[in-house]
Regions:
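Hydrophobic/aromatic ligand-binding patch that stacks against planar heteroaromatic rings
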Residues: 15, 19-20, 101, 156, ...
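A Rossmann-like FAD-binding core segment of flavoenzymes
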Residues: 66-84, 88-90, 96-98, 159-238, ...
Length: 285
């Protein structure tokens, strides 16, 4: 039986799940927990409610309905996305192979305004350790982050590179890192280099020489996961076509991560379209 894995349990993710499971496709939703909807005190502009509804209540009803129809929800954090013979979402609870994946984790967090971070993207700044570790064999690199997502990237790099430095950029550690990883808690003032990364400048002016910086801030949102497969991204928005498919076959995105109007109604529509089109594509084989 074909299966779809959806990353995110907000309006877009649950809507996609409803349409996919009703189309006869085995559907699993991976969720780290409540998102932006749960922080909404009241919603007054959503179809079908005579009185304002709170975000948590709307979320509860939606998930309850999806479970009733057979959608499986798994509480875990997605940390990677790969494709060998099929798409696979890597999580803290294990790997979830899928015939199609829908990314619906909401809008990406703002990337810190570190000079050189975006300018050297693809020239020493990377968003995917599994994709690019090979190019840094025997070299000194850094991972920018402090949590489980950063740990996942560190573990992919350690067998390949000479050394890994963890740059927390002032944030507290929220994961246990291997002892061979050098942890630097200072703020990063700049990523250095002209043609390619040569190092980082830390608060106070100290410079650490490096050949690459891997970005793994916070949790792996939809944009970060899309980048891991080379899907087109414009700023913090995942590029999709009129069927909500990214530039990678079988990979879809819906909701705030695609940009535009950041509203529940828009997220529900895009989720419905992504779930419908993904299921339709699987039926065609």
């Amino acid at each position: 039986m074909s299966n779809i894995v959806i990353v995110g349990s907000g309006p877009a993710g649950v809507s996609a799940a409803l349409y996919a499971v009703r189309a006869g496709v085995q559907t699993t939703v991976l969720t780290k927990g409540s998102g932006a909807l749960a922080r909404a005190e009241k919603i007054e502009n959503y179809y079908g409610f005579a009185q304002p509804v709170s975000g948590p209540e709307l979320e509860r009803r939606s998930i309850e309905n999806a479970r009733r129809l057979g959608v499986q929800f798994v509480q875990t954090e997605a940390v990677g996305l790969t494709w060998t013979d099929r798409l696979t979402v890597e999580t803290l609870a294990g790997a979830y192979p899928a015939d199609a994946v829908i990314l619906a984790t909401g809008a990406s967090r703002a990337v810190p305004r570190i000079p050189g971070l975006t300018g050297l993207e693809g020239h020493g700044v990377s968003w995917c350790a599994a994709c690019d570790a090979f190019f840094y064999r025997g070299k000194d690199v850094a991972v920018l982050g402090s949590g489980e997502y950063a740990l996942h990237e560190v573990q992919a790099l350690l067998p390949v590179v000479k050394s890994v430095t963890l740059l927390t950029n002032g944030a507290a550690l929220t994961a246990d890192f291997p002892p061979e990883v050098s942890v630097c808690t200072q703020k990063v003032e700049a990523i250095l280099g002209e043609q390619t990364v040569t190092g980082v400048q830390l608060a106070g002016g100290a410079v650490r020489e490096l050949s690459g910086v891997f970005v793994a801030l916070g949790v792996a949102g939809s944009t970060a996961l899309a980048r891991k497969l080379g899907a087109a991204v414009e700023g913090s928005r995942i590029v999709v076509d009129d069927k909500m498919q990214t530039t990678v076959p079988g990979l879809y995105a819906a909701g705030d991560c695609t940009g535009g109007l950041l509203q529940v109604a828009k997220a529900v529509y895009e989720g419905a379209l992504a779930g419908t089109e993904a299921a339709k594509a699987l039926r065609k084989g």
